[in-house]
């Protein structure tokens, strides 16, 4: 086998490989003979079909298969000999060949050489926080509202009420698509409608008809409505006031607390909030570390890896549409390119961190991650058992653990300062960013 290596551009490499033509001819002849023994063709006894007949029927397909196998096998031998690390599958193109030699060209990208830089310049503001009794009380108040019952009242609508309304929206006197509804149930104070809409309903009583003027935000999802001033003609059909359940032992039973009453519920809420806080704090630090790592290190990215990641992200996005995905056009790659590039770059850089620090997934950490995740389920032991019995899921969890260890290794050399943060403000911000 003769091999020549050519750098075409960037990370792309081109191998020209020449092998004895006899390799292919012998393999083709052997395959034809084997097929002749197995073939069942009318007019011939089993195992007695002439090779010439098999060649006429299947020779072209057999030669293509053998040629592909020879190219793949010799390509692998060539990249090992030349110490090349391909990123993605190669493309094979047959080259100039004669009776003695078969030549082909393999084109592919290689992984970039990664040399970590500026790790000591990564700046991280590490947030610290605790779940207080006041935070637990706030959560209980939220749960009360979620379990509220509503009844019609004759007073003016106020924050926290539900209002059933008819509305017709118009811009410059013309109605617009999606701006009309009847008997629409509006939760006042929820912030789900555009600014000014909910507050415009407050203060009015059932039976009143009135207009509200609002401005659509510049970042509104409908392009034709961004920044536009709209008038909504409102008919208020009914105002409903909330009746909140009392916070007592009976309230605790609504959440499956059979023993311990209200105090047990508070303890469970505090535990869950603490777990969520810990996850959010770790995610925040990880994001800062990765952003710093990316800022300090510029590397060339294999286009094949980006394309592969785009496909993964595209499939994930389509899955979120469920049954509707079948009737949707394919989402354009541009939607995912930036995210794909980030994921590929992070993967390559963290891979080098893992290699440099000789990291291996700590089994104790892996089990801790599984236990933490399982604690959110009704039967944690069942979830732990399921994970431990599934090799693919265990490998995924080991990858998570290894990534955590890599981030911790980077933190050791980073410039870290601590900052105390309010639980509610921090979690609200984390939810918005997530």
Curated annotation (Swiss-Prot):
Primary subcellular site in the record, as a coarse category: cytoplasm
Reading the lineage from the top rank, the first entry is Bacteria
GO biological processes = 'de novo' cotranslational protein folding; cell division; chaperone-mediated protein folding; protein transport; protein unfolding
Query: What reaction does this catalyse?
Result: [protein]-peptidylproline (omega=180) = [protein]-peptidylproline (omega=0)
Q: Pfam family example for this protein?
A: Trigger_N
Q: SUPFAM superfamilies per the record? A: FKBP-like, Triger factor/SurA peptide-binding domain-like, Trigger factor ribosome-binding domain
Query: Could you give one GO CC term from the UniProt record?
Result: cytoplasm
Q: Where is the signal peptide?
A: none
- S-S bonds: none
Q: What PANTHER family does this protein map onto?
A: TRIGGER FACTOR CHAPERONE AND PEPTIDYL-PROLYL CIS/TRANS ISOMERASE, TRIGGER FACTOR-LIKE PROTEIN TIG, CHLOROPLASTIC
**What family is reported?**
Belongs to the FKBP-type PPIase family. Tig subfamily.
Anything noted about its domains? Consists of 3 domains; the N-terminus binds the ribosome, the middle domain has PPIase activity, while the C-terminus has intrinsic chaperone activity on its own.
Listed name of the protein: Trigger factor
Q: Which gene produces this protein?
A: tig
């Amino acid at each position: 086998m003769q091999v020549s290596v050519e750098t075409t551009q960037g990370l792309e490499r081109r191998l020209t490989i020449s092998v004895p033509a006899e390799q292919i001819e012998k393999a083709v002849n052997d395959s034809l003979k084997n097929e002749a023994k197995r073939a069942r063709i009318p007019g011939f006894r089993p195992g007695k079909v002439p090779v010439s007949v098999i060649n006429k029927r299947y020779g072209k397909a057999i030669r293509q298969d053998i040629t592909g196998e020879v190219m793949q096998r010799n390509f692998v031998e060539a990249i090992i000999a030349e110490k090349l690390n391909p990123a993605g599958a190669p493309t094979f193109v047959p080259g100039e060949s004669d009776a003695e030699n078969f030549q082909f060209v393999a084109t592919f990208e290689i992984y970039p050489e990664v040399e970590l830089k500026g790790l000591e310049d990564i700046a991280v503001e590490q947030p610290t926080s605790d779940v207080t009794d006041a935070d637990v009380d706030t959560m209980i108040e939220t749960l009360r509202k979620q379990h509220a019952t509503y009844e019609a009242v004759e007073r003016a609508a106020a924050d926290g009420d539900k209002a059933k309304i008819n509305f017709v929206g118009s811009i410059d006197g013309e109605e617009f698509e999606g701006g009309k509804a009847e008997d629409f149930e509006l939760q006042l104070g929820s912030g789900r409608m555009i600014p000014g809409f909910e507050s415009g309903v407050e203060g009015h009583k059932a039976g009143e008809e009135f207009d509200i003027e609002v401005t659509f935000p510049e970042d509104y999802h409908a392009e034709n409505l961004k920044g536009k001033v709209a008038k909504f003609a409102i008919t208020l059909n009914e105002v409903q006031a909330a009746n909140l359940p009392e916070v007592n032992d009976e309230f605790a039973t609504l959440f499956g607390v059979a023993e311990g009453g209200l105090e047990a519920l508070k303890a469970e809420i505090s535990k869950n909030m603490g777990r969520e806080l810990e996850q959010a704090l770790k995610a925040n630090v990880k994001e800062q570390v990765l952003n710093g790592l990316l800022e300090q290190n510029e590397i060339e990215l294999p286009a094949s890896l980006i394309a592969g990641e785009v496909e993964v992200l595209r499939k994930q996005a389509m899955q979120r549409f469920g049954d509707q995905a079948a009737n949707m056009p394919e989402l354009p790659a541009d939607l995912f390119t930036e995210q794909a590039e980030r994921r590929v770059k992070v993967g390559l850089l963290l891979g080098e961190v893992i290699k440099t620090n000789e990291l291996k997934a700590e089994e104790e950490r892996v089990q801790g991650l599984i236990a933490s995740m399982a604690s959110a389920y009704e039967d944690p032991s069942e979830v732990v058992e399921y994970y431990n019995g599934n090799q693919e899921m265990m490998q995924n969890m080991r990858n998570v653990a290894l990534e955590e260890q890599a981030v911790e290794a980077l933190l050791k050399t980073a410039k870290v300062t601590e900052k105390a943060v309010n639980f509610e403000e921090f979690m609200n911000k984390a939810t918005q960013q997530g």
